[in-house]
Amino acid sequence: MIIDGKRVSEKRLELIKEEIDESGLYPRLATVIAGDNPASLLYVQMKHRACERVHIGSISITLPGDSTTAKVLETIDRLNKDPEINGILVQLPLPAGVDTEQVIEAILPEKDVDGFHPFNLGKLLGGSPTFAPCTPLGIMTLLKEYKIDPAGKRAVVIGRSIDVGRPMAALLINANATVTVCHSRTKDLAAELRKADIIVSAMGKARFITGDMVSGDAVVIDVGINHVDGKLCGDVDFASVSEKVAAITPVPGGVGPMTIATLMENTFKAAKMQSCRTVH
């Protein structure tokens, strides 16, 4: 079975638009990007197009590539203080001279729609998340949509970043899965994968996972974004793995669209929370 993230994201975006229109709220998202990295610029454009589609207002702030940490923090502070802005997203990676951790921690937790602030990550680990990072949360939505219940299953997460690996593991634990996190120091990755019912790969190695490394009843979620011979591909060798497993996400058209749909959901959630606080 092919898990169609594009289809599910379209469905979610339509639902979000309806909910926003019925709410009477006008959520607003601010994106901050430093430099002219083509991939980052493309991702930001996609996010703003999604905002327009679901009736979320958005502004884009582009800073020079040689911006200092202080300059980025100044921008964040201004957005934190702006009551018209409900969500703040800093497009990563930031230029080498900018302290990414300091920038993330400067965003107000209630406007941290990316879910990277230590406060929000802590709540996620505690089992009561306010905002979870968009890619892992989007994956959980995909699993739910396809009636794949992680409870009691063995899940292997490859990667330990704060944007995918670590929060993905936490969400799966919260869903009662038995979770193993693998990474560059894991001694026998294939052995771990063969035992897994659910595999989430965010390792960044093109077509690394092959059919002989997975079991026949596995669900494989490919978060990898790699370019080979000018074409986009994931961490999974789709040709060999898709013939064997129970379900798999393609690249493109799998996880990527869900990340953006989840960002819209988080932004609307932020607007609702801030509206309630204003009213009361």
UniProtKB/Swiss-Prot annotation:
Pathway the protein acts in: One-carbon metabolism; tetrahydrofolate interconversion
Key words, A-Z: Amino-acid biosynthesis, Histidine biosynthesis, Hydrolase, Methionine biosynthesis, Multifunctional enzyme, NADP, One-carbon metabolism, Oxidoreductase, Purine biosynthesis
GO cellular component labels: cytosol
Catalysed reactions, as listed in the record: (6R)-5,10-methylene-5,6,7,8-tetrahydrofolate + NADP(+) = (6R)-5,10-methenyltetrahydrofolate + NADPH; (6R)-5,10-methenyltetrahydrofolate + H2O = (6R)-10-formyltetrahydrofolate + H(+)
UniProt similarity note: Belongs to the tetrahydrofolate dehydrogenase/cyclohydrolase family.
Function of the molecule: Catalyzes the oxidation of 5,10-methylenetetrahydrofolate to 5,10-methenyltetrahydrofolate and then the hydrolysis of 5,10-methenyltetrahydrofolate to 10-formyltetrahydrofolate.
Assembly and binders: Homodimer.
Record's protein name: Bifunctional protein FolD
